[in-house]
Amino acid sequence: MHCPFCRHPDSRVVDSRETDEGQAIRRRRSCPECGRRFTTVETAVLAVVKRSGVTEPFSREKVIRGVRRACQGRQVDDDALNKLAQQVEDAVRATGSPEVPANEVGLAILGPLRDLDEVAYLRFASVYRSFSSAEDFEREIEALRAHREVSARS
């Protein structure tokens, strides 16, 4: 790696540590030419493939924005949204694929959101799954009730 100070083409790794809950590696480096130290952060790139075929980097902030809209007027704090976004990223990364279709990101949001706030879940699901009638909402509410009963038993 080039030194950012003198542009020397090589550097030595002095220390490496995991950061961001294991999603990145922070490396402390030293330049043999000028002797200065600098830090680099390495992350595995995770890309989302949209329906149009366009690829963009995965963004926790985008997940939070979408879920925050569904949570508008609900008692959901920023810490819960950040935790949900981390769960979504972990689920998407667990697929092992460097490129994930956008609909898989949406599916990864639904589970944690259902556990966080059922009303926000219904709002998000209605847009994500393109509900077009009251019957669509009724079916989803029945599925929520069934999930709640199964969760209560275990």
From Swiss-Prot:
Binds 1 zinc ion. A zinc finger (unnamed) spans 3-34. Belongs to the NrdR family. NCBIfam families: transcriptional regulator NrdR. Negatively regulates transcription of bacterial ribonucleotide reductase nrd genes and operons by binding to NrdR-boxes. Its cofactor is Zn(2+). Residues 46-136 form the ATP-cone domain. The keyword Nucleotidyltransferase does not apply. Keywords: ATP-binding, DNA-binding, Metal-binding, Nucleotide-binding, Repressor, Transcription, Transcription regulation, Zinc, Zinc-finger. GO terms for molecular function: ATP binding; DNA binding; zinc ion binding. One of its GO terms (biological process) is negative regulation of DNA-templated transcription. It comes from Mycolicibacterium gilvum (strain PYR-GCK). It comes from the Bacteria. This is Transcriptional repressor NrdR.
